[in-house]
Curated annotation (Swiss-Prot):
GO terms for cellular component: plasma membrane. The chain crosses the membrane at residues 34-54, 97-117, 136-156, 178-198, 207-227, 242-262. It is a multi-pass membrane protein. This is UPF0761 membrane protein VSAL_I2938. It is found in: Cell inner membrane. It comes from the Bacteria. NCBIfam families: PRK01637.1, yihY_not_rbn. InterPro entries: UPF0761_bac, Virul_fac_BrkB. Belongs to the UPF0761 family. It comes from Aliivibrio salmonicida (strain LFI1238). Keywords: Cell inner membrane, Cell membrane, Membrane, Transmembrane, Transmembrane helix.
Length: 310
């Protein structure tokens, strides 16, 4: 039993060392900064396109505002009045644009999804690109089905709330608990779909589940931590005043992308077990605290019996 525990511990240590080196190699923080910048430029166009898709269906009249309020309340922690007001103002201003401007909005939103596609495929070391028609179909599916699924879940929630069965105290308590888990379920589903569908290679479901669960937990913890920071240390609003919405939103988007990419790194590294399993690696690499996996090759060569190595 003790030997199995030690072996599991060494396996875990080997994996975390490999994951650390992988994250450093992929320059995760730099990629997250790039994605945050692209997202900040494409956020309003993307939301506008999503809301315009909903507005094309009479049954979804008024759904845009419902989805917008739900996203701001549950996925932007402690959104100050400045952030919420600025987002709504930016989105409302797009209604004054011409057809040409609307076309540019669509292009900007596709550019964001394309950037996500490139970043995740780089993490999975995918060099083969998808066919243009397949990529366009995938992007179009995200732009159309995404808001419809969110609205459908919110509509189902509203319908259940209106039922007489909700008058029962036990059922009502259970429903409120379930409703509280809805944002977590949606974020986990989004991470899972992202890690399964975007990479242009076959991903094992259990690896994607671990990555999505890790990213989901980090996301929920980050929401609480970021909300506490914004409310307890409102330095951005003191320094920037009315412009505080921009840096606050950028920092949160940057943090979100770090979480997304960490989840992707976890999912991808689980599929590369041949590089971190203890049986495949020189075990004395774990004796030193600051030793990294790449040093094991040098240690092996120095101990070689090959005359050329001496």
């Amino acid at each position: 039993m003790e030997e199995k525990f030690k072996y599991s511990l060494r396996i875990s240590w080997s994996y975390f060392l490999f994951l650390k080196q992988r994250i450093i190699h992929d320059r995760l923080t730099v990629s997250a900064g790039y994605m945050a910048y692209i997202t900040l430029l494409s956020l309003v166009p993307l939301v506008t396109v999503l809301l315009s898709v909903l507005s094309q269906f009479p049954i979804f009249s008024g759904a845009g505002e419902t989805v917008q309020e739900f996203v701001i309340q549950n996925f932007v922690p402690a959104a100050s009045d400045a952030v919420e007001g600025s987002l709504k103002e930016f989105i409302s201003n797009t209604g004054k644009m011409t057809a040409v401007g609307s076309g540019f909005l669509f292009v900007a939103s596709v550019m964001l999804i394309s950037a996500i596609d490139r970043s995740l495929n780089y993490i999975w070391r995918v060099k083969k690109k998808r066919r243009p028609m397949y990529s366009f179909s995938l992007y179009w599916m995200i732009l159309t089905l995404g808001p419809l699924l969110v609205w459908a879940s919110l509509a189902a929630t509203s319908y259940v709330t209106s039922l007489n069965i909700m008058d029962d105290e036990i059922v009502s308590s259970f429903y409120r608990t379930l409703l509280g888990w809805l944002p977590i379920i949606l974020s986990f589903s989004a991470f899972l779909g992202l890690y399964l569908l975007v990479p242009n290679k076959k991903i094992r479901v259990r690896h994607a589940l671990v990555g999505a669960m890790s990213a989901g937990c980090l996301f929920e913890v980050s929401k609480v931590g970021f909300a506490q920071y914004i409310t307890q240390f409102p330095s951005y609003e003191v320094i920037y005043g009315a412009l505080a919405a921009v840096p606050i939103l950028f920092v949160w988007i940057y943090l979100c992308w770090i979480i997304v990419l960490i989840g992707a790194e976890i999912t991808a590294s689980l599929g590369e077990s041949d590089q971190w399993l203890i049986d495949k690696i020189n075990t004395h690499v774990f004796d030193a605290e600051n030793t990294v996996l790449t040093e094991s090759k040098g240690l092996t060569e120095s101990d070689s019996t090959d005359p050329k190595s001496k």
